[in-house]
UniProtKB/Swiss-Prot annotation:
<dbReference type="GO" id="GO:0022627">
    <property type="term" value="C:cytosolic small ribosomal subunit"/>
</dbReference>
<keyword id="KW-0689">Ribosomal protein</keyword>
<dbReference type="Pfam" id="PF00318">
    <property type="entry name" value="Ribosomal_S2"/>
</dbReference>
<protein>
    <recommendedName>
        <fullName>Small ribosomal subunit protein uS2</fullName>
    </recommendedName>
</protein>
<dbReference type="InterPro" id="IPR005706">
    <property type="entry name" value="Ribosomal_uS2_bac/mit/plastid"/>
</dbReference>
<dbReference type="GO" id="GO:0006412">
    <property type="term" value="P:translation"/>
</dbReference>
<dbReference type="InterPro" id="IPR001865">
    <property type="entry name" value="Ribosomal_uS2"/>
</dbReference>
<dbReference type="InterPro" id="IPR018130">
    <property type="entry name" value="Ribosomal_uS2_CS"/>
</dbReference>
<keyword id="KW-0687">Ribonucleoprotein</keyword>
<dbReference type="GO" id="GO:0003735">
    <property type="term" value="F:structural constituent of ribosome"/>
</dbReference>
<comment type="similarity">
    <text>Belongs to the universal ribosomal protein uS2 family.</text>
</comment>
<feature type="compositionally biased region" description="Low complexity">
    <location>
        <begin position="238"/>
        <end position="261"/>
    </location>
</feature>
<feature type="region of interest" description="Disordered">
    <location>
        <begin position="237"/>
        <end position="267"/>
    </location>
</feature>
<dbReference type="InterPro" id="IPR023591">
    <property type="entry name" value="Ribosomal_uS2_flav_dom_sf"/>
</dbReference>
Length: 267
């Protein structure tokens, strides 16, 4: 496949152009603002289009080199969408609470992931002789760790790139990535600082339809990267008898080649 296509019409229908109330703006967003309507800033989609296309190319190239992409979106309307996009594209995600040190203190996070795996093994065993209370306590611990770390349990190390919905809410995640030199792609609304990310995408970061569109495009770009990587290794995805090395690739490829879905309804 190739990089995913999108149109100005899709962006408009998803409400990508709607910013926040004018009094909430960040002056650094001035170059990306078209104007205002009813005290709401209107984002200049003529700038969003090339910047979004650039972000898709960077994602495809990074994943095509074997890089790992981390989706980050913990706000209510982004949580499920982010997780689904990451799973479809065989990538990784944080969609609950960002734990301080998730990137900068990876050793501690790795220990927690190992604990999560041990709990899974313990709870799947019938021979531990646990009481109901002991099992319940272990299940609660496992569920808590799964919510926080389930999306990165197989990542192996820090990611090679991060895609963020709402840089204000995910400020700690962005700071940690910058400290480690991890490139950040992010949707920047009219109240955000575009200078804190490497690849800004001016747009609405609150509407579920807009979030669904961004995540779908980023996921498809990652799938394109995986397929190009396998192609460069001489793997014929269409005729290979062996299963793809990425566990989610089969589902991802099928969905990516289907006709584009309409983004979800706005929150």
């Amino acid at each position: 496949m190739a990089l995913p296509d999108f149109s100005m019409r899709q962006l408009l229908e998803a409400g990508v152009h709607f910013g926040h109330q004018t009094h909430r703006w960040n002056p650094k967003m001035t170059p990306y603002i078209f104007g205002e309507r009813n005290n709401i800033h209107i984002i200049d989609l003529s700038q969003t289009v090339p910047l979004l296309h650039q972000a898709l190319k960077v994602v495809s190239d990074t994943v095509g080199r074997g890089g790992r992409l981390l989706f980050v979106g913990t706000k209510r309307q982004a949580s499920d969408i982010v997780a689904d996009a990451a799973r479809r594209s065989a990538q990784y995600y944080v969609n609950s609470r960002w734990l301080g040190g998730m990137l900068t203190n990876w050793k501690t996070i790795s220990n927690s992931i190992q604990r999560l795996r041990r709990l899974d093994e313990m709870l799947s065993s019938e021979n531990l002789g646990l009481t109901k209370k002991e099992r319940l306590n272990l299940e609660r611990e496992r569920d808590k760790l799964e919510r926080a770390l389930g999306g990165i349990r197989d990542m192996g190390s820090t990611p090679d790139m991060m895609f963020v919905i709402d840089t204000n809410k995910e400020a700690i995640a962005v700071q940690e990535a910058r400290r480690l030199g991890i490139p950040v792609i992010a949707v920047i609304d009219s109240n955000c600082d575009p200078d804190v990310v490497d690849y800004p995408i001016p747009g609405n970061d609150d509407a579920a339809r807009a979030i669904a569109l961004y995540c779908d495009l980023i996921a498809k770009a990652a799938i394109d990267g995986i397929e190009r990587q396998q192609g460069s290794l001489g793997v014929d995805i269409g005729e290979s008898a062996a299963a793809p090395s990425e566990p989610a690739l089969e589902t991802a490829s099928a969905e990516a080649t289907a006709e584009g879905e309409q983004p979800g309804s706005q929150a």
